[in-house]
Amino acid sequence: MGLQSYVVNYLGGSGYVALTNIQSINLHIGVQAQLEQIKASTATVVIRYPTGFASPIAQLKSGTDVTIQNNTVPASPYDIWQGKISDVSVEYGMPYSGGVGNADYATISMEGYFADLGRMDGADYAMAAGTLASQMISATTQSGVSMAYITGGETRTGAATTVSSTWGDWVARTALSNNARLRDGAEMTTGKVNIISPFNVVPFDYAFSDAPTGTNQKYDVINFDSLSDNYYNQVSVATESFGTSTVLASGVFKPYRTYQVNTINASLSQADDFANYLLNNYKTPKLAISSISATAEQQTTFKLDQMVSIFSLYYYPGCSVNITFRGTTYPCVIEGVSMSATPESTRFTFYVSGADLNAYLILNDATFGKLDSNRLGY
């Protein structure tokens, strides 16, 4: 497969306008490790001004809407990410005495929609107890940023709380309390900020392999890790209003390896279930796939930025994928993805967690619907 072509568009006075002279694009979505706190997606674009930055583009400023598109087929481009400009910095190149012209570079930093919530004062809003769906509607009304909790068919409840910090802090604690993931790189029909239930695991349409056939995607780098943050023998889950639940693995001695979580769980029973789930998940050290990396150019059929046929990179956190390595297939869940593109090459890195660290029973699912293969989720 040949090089992929990407374009970065900014919102101008009469619609989106493509940037020119792009030197590189770097994009990061999701997290790298399962227990890492959710964070806004980010992107960085470097462009060159061969005639100098004397007349900068007026719209290149904080808050301007941007999109990154794959336009390899110009007649049918598709968005892989959306967000806003957070910063623009310019490095001015001094011309040489021999007559070489100015070499000015602008670095445009961008961020997903969750970042807006991180700067938005909660104003001590009294969030009523209720389903997460209803709480997200209230949060949307108060913040002005559309958001939703995407379930896997279950109904989750959230405790009453006062949003005394930022709306981003409330969303992050809600996600943590429910072991959920974040998607914030597109204005989807469900909202700009989506918290994804751990039961909402969407399978990729394609798989990864070191010896691919058909449309499977080929990777050339694979990493296995035994992360310290994936091993604890004591878990303590604190709630705002119902006390703390602490559970301990059997047969262990002090000093304990303790994972402490501050949640807004709706009851002590919910905290108990969460604590036991986390302990059962992480009480045994494991060596597992943590990431794989692949280039666009090595694919027979390129699908790396659209492995769910109707969605793109912004949709990846929470999707399941099979990775085949030396004849063994490992079911995994995507935690995050990064893309690094230059005119010479485009590389994607996928950060994953093993299916055994996502212990949920999802009926009729090829991986998570097998009894005796997974512990029940809380």
Where are these regions (language model features)?
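Acidic, small/polar-enriched beta strand-loop surface segments
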Residues: 1-19, 172, 176, 181-333, ...
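Surface-exposed cap/loop segments at beta↔alpha junctions
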Residues: 2-5, 39-42, 48-148, 347, ...
